[in-house]
């Protein structure tokens, strides 16, 4: 195994590289996305696809629609021939015309905030029928996840609200022709697992915005600086976060709080900085010290025992990654240099990102 000579040293500060100018997805890119999804439906033998979206679970819906419906639920009902219906609540009905693909809107007030005006003329079942859902068709349902459990029937796990799933079942007569179709977006060869040049530029804006924010927050670190001041460096340009912003000094989650407070940085504190936008997140964790003598008792070999091995693994990752490499190959290479039994990591050495901080692994 290749050995690395990792040393703590001063180096020039990396330049910030966010252009500050979001890159829009072109019409050609949206058509390419639609073509990929329709081909995936054909490969799965699906006659219809129902894609769910809300503020927390928006990526698959937004992939074709171009926007997400914030505080309301929504459905994109896509037929194999490309015909689309947008099932929208009160405050998103006026955005049907803003969708990046052509389609017809169906107004479902049940998707709206509590106590807003409700339609009294049709049930949810009737409105889903109006959107084209019908018995006898093979229908894929995409919520957020592509399930890969070794002990569950993944095709029959549906991660959408029960009241919507119940109404779909009422139309179709049960689950027989309903299948989880998260793999069309997130599975091996899924539509969202590869990007064209336009998509890469689109996502790079968010990734660079996040890394610039972390760099500025690190530059601000000093005894007496409040977590809120650090957090102000992380959230920027009014963009939508893909992950909870973290600016923490010392103990975290006091009284359940996850967000920056007026607590200030103290010498010897653990520091956590994280921010993410569509396209990527950046995170740094370390100690607020000037040298090893200020590290807490029992952690004075932190650089040698933790930071240097992690940096070596990161270097290995960058050197080894290449087109055609399997996730298993990368996993083994990181396991070799940073064994889980010693360092205690438990997820994986890398994952895909998009609108979500974690798309799939």
Where does each model-flagged region fall?
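Active-site neighborhoods and metal-handling regions in enzymes and metal-associated proteins
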Residues: 1-361
């Amino acid at each position: 195994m290749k050995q690395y000579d990792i040393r703590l040293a001063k180096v020039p500060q990396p330049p910030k590289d966010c252009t500050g100018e979001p890159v829009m997805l072109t019409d050609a890119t949206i058509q390419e996305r639609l073509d990929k999804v329709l081909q995936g439906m054909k490969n799965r033998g699906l006659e219809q696809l129902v894609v769910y979206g809300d503020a927390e679970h928006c990526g698959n819906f937004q992939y074709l629609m171009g926007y997400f419906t914030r505080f309301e639920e929504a459905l994109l009902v896509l037929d194999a021939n490309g015909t689309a219906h947008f099932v929208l609540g009160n405050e998103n009905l006026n955005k049907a015309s803003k969708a990046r693909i052509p389609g017809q809107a169906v107004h479902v007030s049940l998707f709206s905030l509590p106590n807003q005006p409700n339609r009294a003329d049709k049930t949810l079942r009737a409105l889903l029928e109006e959107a084209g859902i019908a018995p006898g068709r093979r229908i894929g349902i995409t919520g957020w996840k592509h399930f890969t459990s070794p002990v569950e029937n993944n095709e029959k796990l549906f991660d959408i609200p029960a009241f919507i799933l119940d109404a779909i079942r009422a139309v179709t007569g049960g689950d027989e022709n309903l299948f989880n179709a998260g793999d069309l977006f997130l599975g091996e060869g899924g539509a969202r697992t590869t990007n064209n040049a336009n998509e890469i530029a689109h996502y790079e804006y968010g990734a660079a915005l996040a890394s610039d924010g972390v760099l500025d927050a690190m530059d601000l670190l000093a005894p007496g600086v409040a977590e809120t001041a650090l957090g102000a460096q992380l959230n920027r340009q009014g963009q939508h976060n893909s992950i909870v912003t973290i600016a923490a000094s010392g103990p975290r989650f006091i009284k359940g709080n996850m967000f920056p407070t007026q607590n200030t940085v103290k010498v010897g504190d653990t520091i956590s900085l994280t921010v993410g936008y569509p396209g990527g997140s950046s995170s740094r964790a370390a100690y607020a010290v000037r040298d090893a003598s200020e590290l807490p008792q029992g952690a004075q070999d932190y650089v040698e025992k933790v930071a240097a091995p992690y940096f070596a693994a990161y270097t290995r990752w960058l050197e080894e990654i290449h087109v055609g490499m399997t996730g298993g190959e990368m996993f083994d290479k990181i396991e070799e240099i940073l064994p889980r039994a010693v360092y205690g990591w438990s997820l994986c050495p890398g994952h895909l990102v998009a609108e979500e901080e974690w798309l799939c692994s």
